[in-house]
Amino acid sequence: MKKHTSLLLAALLAFGTSFAGNPDRAGSAGASQLLINPWAASNGLAGSNMASVKGLESTFLNVAGLAFVERNELAFANSMYLGGTGIALNSLGFATKVGGSGVLGLSVTSMSLGDIPITTEDLPEGGIGSFSPAFSNIGVTYSKSFSNSIYGGLTMRIVSESISNVRASGVCFDAGIRYVTGENDGLRFGIALRNVGAPMRYAGDGLTVTATPQGADEALTVFQRSEKYELPSLVNIGVAVDVVSNDNTVVTATGQFVSNSFTKDQFGGGLEANLGERLVLRGGYLWEQGLITGGQDVTTAYTGPAGGIGLNVPAGEGATLKLDYSYRTTNPFNGTHTLGVKISL
């Protein structure tokens, strides 16, 4: 088993290296919705808990964490993305135990961009209605515990982006591994490869133009071909360690490195404190080059800090209700607020 795991880790690292790009490629990929974390608890740590995240939230960071679902889990989250823009994210997921060591999960994320005025060459000021882009992705995940120390998972995700007369769709895959060791499983390592798939292309009636060529008597309809665009593939490597662990308090330090194919690499860290059985406090920071010094080379609206709080509430025999809130600072805009509800049955 250790030999097979080592080979799989080496394959993920080698495959991921081929995707490692540079910031000069920023803006040349599409389907950027795949880079937005829709879940509340992990946003409170700026996503730095990829090596320790469990349950449905792991379907975004490291799918190996889904293997820790004990029976059934249902989750919902709502994000007010970049406050003031009117953009909202809604995410819904369900996971269930399959067999003795496997977990099957389904997650759906939709992104609402609000109503955008329709403008044309003849009516550049609008006044003829509005349109609403529809961005969504649906993921099917299978995760498995191979031993008491080794966990792995794979996700197939269908991606869709459209307006009324133009649409693009595609399929991508995520894979992840987690290794757990140390006293009371207090040390965890993770690696994940995300958003790997074939290029996507927009198509539809919106790419046609009807015009009458000079000297012609009849109008012609011309179809304009769109260019393909790549998906924002990345490799994520993380570690988590319980720095305090006793009957009443568990404090976990988390860290991660993200190698992005189409933007700057990122480093993140965070602390999660479980105080008793009810209260959870979270704080994190995500750094990339140029974030602290500012200037024209800043390529993200996020300024780094994140924080959150969670409450665990008993919900009957064998069931737990978890309420989470997180906030991430941005400049400009008014930050990103995320509320989440999870029920373990």
Regions found by a protein language model. Give the residues of each.
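Generic cytosolic/nucleocytoplasmic N-terminal low-complexity/intrinsically disordered segments
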Residues: M1-K2, V341
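Sec-dependent signal peptide recognition
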Residues: K2-A10
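Short, linear, compositionally biased motifs with a strong N-terminal bias
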Residues: A10-A11, E70
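Subset of outer-membrane beta-barrel
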Residues: F19-L345
